[in-house]
């Protein structure tokens, strides 16, 4: 658990995006973002796409990094 959360946490920190800003952009409760970032819960596949879309509206580079980090981590898990 946590591959999306790790990627999201890194991107939010790198691009100085608050959890609240992402939540407002996505139209979800900040508690959802908090759970993902703290790896208490993984977002479902649709939410991963919604995260990417919201990040794109905030900063396109952040969206690209999120997907790259998420997929790189996923690829590593598949190779284990």
Where do the PLM segments sit?
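A short, Lys/Arg-rich alpha-helix, primarily the initiator
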Residues: 1-15, 21, 25, 52
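A general structural motif at alpha-helix termini
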Residues: 26, 37, 67-71
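Recognition helix of helix-turn-helix/homeodomain-like DNA-binding domains
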Residues: 27-43
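Conserved N-terminal glycine/acidic-rich loop preference
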Residues: 29-31, 47, 70-76
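Short, basic-rich loop-to-helix N-cap that marks the start of a DNA-contacting helix
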Residues: 40-53
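Short, charged recognition helix plus adjacent turn
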Residues: 61-80
